[in-house]
Amino acid sequence: MNDTIASTVRLTQYSHGAGCGCKISPKVLEKILHSDMEKWVDPHLLVGNETKDDAAVYDIGNGIGIISTTDFFMPIVDDPFDFGRIAATNAISDIFAMGGKPIMAIAILGFPIKLLPPEVAQRIVDGGRFACRQAGITLAGGHSIDAPEPIFGLAVTGIINTDKVKKNASATAGCKLFLTKPLGIGVLTTAEKKGKLKAEHQGLATEVMCQMNTIGAKFAEIAGISAMTDVTGFGLLGHLSELCEGSGVRAEVYFDKIKTLDGVQRYIEKGCIPGGTERNFESYGHKIGAMSDLQKAILCDPQTSGGLLIAVDADSEQQVLEIAADDSIELFEVGRLFAKEHDSPILITVL
């Protein structure tokens, strides 16, 4: 099989899930990660999994921290090269979400060798290699297995000054919430998988998913950004609820300010809602105030390689907007943080 034939393979037909939408639901994941074993605390581990942050951070001394993360999933698009590029971009994003700089990656590949020829896998890995080059790092190795469905991703190592780490559990009341990418990736990729995506929307989600969140490293220099995380498989409300829970704050989300990819509402009306949307809502819906069906479909939509969600204090807002503009990133406000009401289980109100 040559590259031309490889590019005609519809990878999404070989997987039951798609991108970050195939994540195990937050509710089930919590049960999996629960342990009765005595916890061993490493004083050098600055960020672990207690707050469900994007990556782990380990203090190696002299004010330097190592960031470690891994992310992989099944095809979200049909083209093998694009799949590899998206999966790699998504994995590298976790380093930027902590405010760090990636330095190296290794690949994770699962491939159905009896169903698809190796040329398809080669294109997937090349896509990953391309994304790594964009991030200024080397794809230094990896591991592969024969699997029933295609799987690809990276384990990524990064570096950061320990006093610059941006966590998802350090947000403060009064901050505005901004997002760097529009929502609706799960909706558009579901429309593509169902064969309902219009010609004018072909490649739109791919373009957004391939945008590298490099600006996260610049945001690390701004003390007035009290928290940062990337929005991926649990949707905006899922990752925002983790931020609120870990930080002891509540949020208001302004739905009329939410930006979505072109055509999202139309595809929602046609039933192009990924299964991950309902799984997400079932996991954290009890923490969210009343919503319309449209609000739920957009705000719980699982994103793959989504944007950075940042909490910004008033004094730093202009600086943040200027840095984003210099990188040709259109930040948009999605809400605001407030002191938590201790007698209410609701963390997020959608207005």
Swiss-Prot record:
The keyword Metal-binding applies. The active site is at residue 20. Binds 1 Mg(2+) ion per monomer. The record marks 23 as: Important for catalytic activity. It catalyses: hydrogenselenide + ATP + H2O = selenophosphate + AMP + phosphate + 2 H(+). ATP binds at residues 23, 51-53, 71, 94, 142-144. Its EC number is 2.7.9.3. InterPro entries: PurM-like_C_dom, PurM-like_C_sf, PurM-like_N, PurM-like_N_sf, SelD_I, SPS/SelD. The keyword Metal-binding applies. It is an enzyme of class 2 (transferase). It holds the Pfam family AIRS. Coiled coil: none annotated. GO terms for molecular function: ATP binding; magnesium ion binding; selenide, water dikinase activity. Mg(2+) binds at residues 54, 94, 230. Its cofactor is Mg(2+). Keywords: ATP-binding, Kinase, Magnesium, Metal-binding, Nucleotide-binding, Selenium, Transferase. One of its GO terms (biological process) is selenocysteine biosynthetic process. One of its GO terms (cellular component) is cytoplasm. Homodimer. Synthesizes selenophosphate from selenide and ATP. Belongs to the selenophosphate synthase 1 family. Class I subfamily. This is Selenide, water dikinase. It comes from Pasteurella multocida (strain Pm70).
